[in-house]
UniProtKB/Swiss-Prot annotation:
<protein>
    <recommendedName>
        <fullName>Enolase</fullName>
        <ecNumber>4.2.1.11</ecNumber>
    </recommendedName>
</protein>
<feature type="binding site">
    <location>
        <position position="274"/>
    </location>
    <ligand>
        <name>Mg(2+)</name>
    </ligand>
</feature>
<dbReference type="InterPro" id="IPR020811">
    <property type="entry name" value="Enolase_N"/>
</dbReference>
<keyword id="KW-0456">Lyase</keyword>
<dbReference type="InterPro" id="IPR036849">
    <property type="entry name" value="Enolase-like_C_sf"/>
</dbReference>
<feature type="binding site">
    <location>
        <position position="326"/>
    </location>
    <ligand>
        <name>(2R)-2-phosphoglycerate</name>
    </ligand>
</feature>
<dbReference type="GO" id="GO:0009986">
    <property type="term" value="C:cell surface"/>
</dbReference>
<dbReference type="GO" id="GO:0000287">
    <property type="term" value="F:magnesium ion binding"/>
</dbReference>
<comment type="similarity">
    <text>Belongs to the enolase family.</text>
</comment>
<dbReference type="Pfam" id="PF03952">
    <property type="entry name" value="Enolase_N"/>
</dbReference>
<feature type="active site" description="Proton donor">
    <location>
        <position position="197"/>
    </location>
</feature>
<dbReference type="GO" id="GO:0004634">
    <property type="term" value="F:phosphopyruvate hydratase activity"/>
</dbReference>
<keyword id="KW-0324">Glycolysis</keyword>
<dbReference type="InterPro" id="IPR020809">
    <property type="entry name" value="Enolase_CS"/>
</dbReference>
<feature type="binding site">
    <location>
        <position position="233"/>
    </location>
    <ligand>
        <name>Mg(2+)</name>
    </ligand>
</feature>
<keyword id="KW-0964">Secreted</keyword>
<keyword id="KW-0479">Metal-binding</keyword>
Length: 401
């Protein structure tokens, strides 16, 4: 059986920050797929290139000139072959011609078109019968590159462990609201805003943020009788300068940063710890994982950039016990699925994640189920974040009915 690609259209659309990104439409007999790609602010050095160095228009021009003709007629059932083809047509090794965002939109749209033709959900087409619901984890206090005048640490996260996905997502929202109330009461003379991911942004220290977070979590957990995990995304690359980790009010050496990450779990009970070290320090990650990996999830994002080769190195060194998955870090569904499978085969958990510049596309909701992710990281509020959470509620309904 073959399902030849009949037509492909690409266009510019706006993301949640009001920046241009790309959207791709793929048409096959009896099927149609559309995907808009997100964009990150905190990006890893080894990610594929989002767009041509000459800009998004140049990436679209490259597609029209060098890619379109070759993919028309290609069998959409051959996802691996399609992804290999657009990788070869790009020719750069890092999608610096076509752009990783456009390759992501094309790759995901092919999968969506086939799932539509077959009349099955995307999560089932990608994951088969091996799928499970993730828990939502979302940013409630933000800083770093996601917010001006915020905390040094980029994300303070919560993950409610409710009986259902819906309950968990809503309890996360309640924590977000509670934090807003606490900040308004305690910080009457300080401006309070929201960052790219709709987390609260306020000019306070990381230690003050911990106090607010823990107060909100304890109060909401007591009110709802739901256990709530806390988490951090250090985004340590944005703190790293000349071998040191530079915070607003202190500077830490490599060893001090390792000790600090360990103390976060021991002193504050933080369960989820993402990117605590610079993205080349596999050994530093491993020291943290060795000390607290039995009590916490140590997650590699910028460390791995969804790259199977880097994940293999992390597995060999015992760097982390979890991997973050972002399709547009690696550029194709095939490579993202390989990354998730590689992690799982080595006993590592995976977390499918949004980007700070999101769209209302919900493909990552389906991938988090298809990849049997422990968590799906997609914020707590905001239309582009809620789109994923609502889709996961629909999927949960299908899986439990």
């Amino acid at each position: 059986m073959e399902l030849p690609i009949e037509d492909v259209r690409v266009r510019k659309v706006l993301d949640s920050r009001g920046n241009f990104t790309v959207e791709a439409d793929v048409y096959i007999p009896g099927g149609f797929g559309r995907t808009s790609a997100p964009a990150g602010a905190s990006t890893g050095e080894t990610e594929v290139i989002a767009f041509s160095k000459k800009g998004i228009d140049e990436s679209i021009k490259f597609f029209e000139t060098n890619v379109r003709r070759s993919i028309i007629g290609f069998n959409a059932l051959d996802q691996k072959g399609f992804d290999a083809l657009i990788t070869d047509l790009d020719g750069s090794g890092n999608f610096s011609n076509l752009g990783g965002n456009l390759s992501t939109a094309l790759s995901m749209s092919v999968a969506k078109a086939v799932s539509a033709h077959l009349g099955i959900p995307l999560y089932r087409y990608v994951g088969g019968i091996n799928h499970s619901m993730p828990r939502p984890i979302g940013n409630v206090i933000g800083g770093g590159k996601h917010a001006r005048n915020g905390t040094s640490i980029q994300e303070f996260l919560v993950s409610a462990q409710g009986k259902t996905f819906m309950e968990s997502a809503y309890v996360n929202v309640l924590v977000h609201r509670k934090i807003g109330d606490i900040l308004s009461e305690k910080m009457k003379d300080i401006s309070i805003g929201v960052g790219d991911e709709r987390a609260w942004s306020v000019n306070i220290s990381d230690e003050e943020a911990f106090e607010v977070l823990n107060q909100a979590v304890n109060e909401v957990s007591s009110e709802t009788k739901v256990k709530i995990y806390t988490g951090l995304d250090f985004a340590a690359d944005s703190l790293y300068e000349n071998g040191k980790y530079v915070y607003k009010h202190t500077v830490r050496s490599r060893d001090e940063q390792i000790d600090y990450a360990i103390s976060i779990n021991k002193d504050f009970g933080v369960y989820y710890i993402e990117d605590p070290m610079f993205d080349t320090d596999f050994e530093g990650f491993a020291e943290i994982t060795k000390k607290i990996g039995d009590k916490a999830m140590i997650v590699g994002d910028d460390l791995y950039t969804t790259n199977p080769d880097r994940i293999r190195k992390g597995i060999e060194l015992g760097s982390t016990n979890a991997v973050l998955i972002k399709v547009n870090q690696i550029g194709t569904l095939t490579k993202a699925q390989e990354a998730a499978s590689l992690a799982s085969s080595a006993g590592l958990k995976n977390v499918v994640s949004h980007r700070s510049g999101e769209t209302t596309d919900d493909f990552l909701a389906h991938l988090s189920v298809a990849f049997s992710s422990t968590f799906v990281k997609t914020g707590t509020i905001g239309g582009e974040r809620i789109a994923k959470l609502n889709e996961l509620m629909r999927i949960e309904e299908c899986l439990t009915s």
